[in-house]
Amino acid sequence: MSTNHLREFRESLMISKTELARKANISSITLTRIEKGKPSRMKTQRKIILALGLKISDKNKVFH
């Protein structure tokens, strides 16, 4: 499992899981798996980072 702070970051922005999944164009199930620490593709991480309004260079704020 990979370490990430996605859930905490998402909640700090007061964004629901459903809303973030929609913005990132991924399924809610995929987002749930990632928040639980399951591995994810770089492409999926990129979608999430951009949907959160971050730059790709800010990846470490969410994913480690």
Task: Report residues per predicted region.
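Short alpha-helical DNA-recognition segment
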Residues: 14-32
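A short, Lys/Arg-rich alpha-helix, primarily the initiator
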Residues: 1-13
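The alpha-helix within a helix-turn-helix
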Residues: 10, 21, 49
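Residues that mark the N-terminal boundary/hinge immediately upstream of a DNA-recognition element
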Residues: 5, 16, 41-44
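DNA major-groove recognition helix of helix-turn-helix/homeodomain DNA-binding modules
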Residues: 42-60
